Structures are given as C-alpha cells and as structure tokens.
Design a protein with these regions (language model features):
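Conserved class I S-adenosyl-L-methionine
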Residues: 43-52
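A short, conserved alpha-helix within the catalytic core of class I
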Residues: 112-121
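Conserved beta-strand signature within the Rossmann-like core of class I S-adenosyl-L-methionine
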Residues: 128-135
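Short catalytic micro-motifs in class I SAM-dependent methyltransferases
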Residues: 107-111
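Class I SAM-dependent methyltransferase Rossmann-like catalytic core
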Residues: 5-31
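A conserved beta-strand element that flanks and buttresses the S-adenosyl-L-methionine
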Residues: 104
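C-terminal alpha-helical "lid/dimerization" subdomain adjacent to the S-adenosyl-L-methionine
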Residues: 58, 135-195
C-alpha cells in the first residue's frame, strides 16, 4: 500500500469524507457554477462532456436563462440526473461537427490517460469555444495534494483515478496543438473555506475558456 493511500485511509478514519460531503461539496458546487457559468456565451447550446449527474450544469442553466445544456458520460448515474444524459464510449462523441456552441469539461480531463483524444472531439462538435475546469500541477507537492483531493472526492463513487495532472505549460501546448486560443483564465477560484484554501487552493485549480481560431 502506498504512503499516500495509508495517509488517505488514516484521515478517512477521522471523518474527512464526511466533512467533504457536508461542507466542501456544497461550496465547490456553488463556486464552480459561478466560475464556469460566467465563461459560457449567452444563449449557448452546450455539451457537458463527462457530466456525471449534471448538477453543476443544471445550476448554470437555472442562473443563466437561455443556455441549454445536455450531457454525455461513459455511464449513467443510478441516482437522479439533472440534465439529459447520453452514454458514450469516452472517445467518440455521438454528435455531428459543430452541433454545439460550447463544449464543457468540469474535472474530467485528469481522469483520462490521453486527454487529447476527447479534446479533439470537443473541438469538432463545438462551434465557438470549449470551457474547462481542471488542475495545474505546478505548485510544490502539487501532484500529491491533487491525488489526495481526488481520492477523497471520487474513490467512493468508483471513479477511475488516473491522477493525470498537467502543468500549465503542458495545457498551453495542448491547446495550441488543437488550434485553440485562451480568451479567459481564472486560477483563483477559492473553492475551499478560509485557511484550507492556502493548502488545497494555491492556484492548483483553474477554469479557462478556449475560443476557436478563425
């Protein structure tokens, strides 16, 4: 068993998962709804890729009348889905070119061994832009910090944890290869309350909007 896994099990015995569910999860949902929603164009038709139960997208729609969002995921959640969801194979999006104004990824790409495959697909189906919420691994002990957060937040749902965290320069190289321009970027999300953000925040999380080059 890895040192990381031992540490994660130890803190779980102290109720960290319960704290995550009761305090952090609700705050994260509210903050991400605001940060992500602001980057989506007015009256956009959006595809949420890897949408889970679609809760964040449904909250964006509630606060931004005129936006329409549907989702795709590799499995459909047993619990309630808040938006229409279609199951797909994780690599081939089942829509024609330019079917949507915007493609959306919220904490999805670091779970994929080769995110470029699905990013190419997102660029194919989106006419205007791609909005991404994900992680930067640039900071001191960034990888370990992100692994811990990922495990606490996702392991209990059976999510495959690839721990595939890129540094900002790697993200920018990927976007350039896809012919995308970063038009908006925010790495001060403040997902965590108070001093906790000094440890788990510190620019490890970002939201960006990528526009298609003409």
């Amino acid at each position: 068993m890895s040192l990381f896994k031992k540490a994660a099990d130890a803190v779980d015995a102290g109720g960290i998962k319960g704290i995550y569910e009761n305090v952090y999860f609700d705050r994260r949902t509210r903050v991400l709804t605001n940060c992500v929603g602001k980057m989506i164009p007015e009256n956009a038709k959006v595809l949420d890729i890897g949408c889970g139960n679609g809760q964040i997208s449904s909250m964006i729609v509630a606060g931004r009348p005129g936006i329409d969002i549907k989702g795709v995921d590799i499995m459909k959640r047993k619990e309630k889905c808040f938006i229409p969801v279609e199951v797909f194979d994780g690599e081939h999006i089942p829509y024609e070119d330019n079917s949507f104004d915007t493609a959306l990824f919220v904490d999805v790409l670091h779970h994929i061994p080769d995110p470029m495959i699905i990013l190419h697909e997102a660029a194919r189906v989106a006419r205007k832009c791609i909005v991404i919420k994900d992680h930067n691994a640039d900071r001191f002990l960034g990888d370990i910090t992100l692994q811990f957060m990922d495990w606490v937040g996702n392991a209990r749902y059976g999510v495959v944890l690839e721990y595939n965290y890129l540094k900002r320069a790697q993200w920018e190289a990927a976007f350039s290869e896809l012919g995308l321009t970063v038009s908006e970027y925010n790495n001060s999300l403040h997902l965590y309350p108070g001093p906790v953000d000094w440890i788990f925040g510190r620019s490890l999380q970002f939201v960006c909007r990528l526009d298609m080059r003409n």
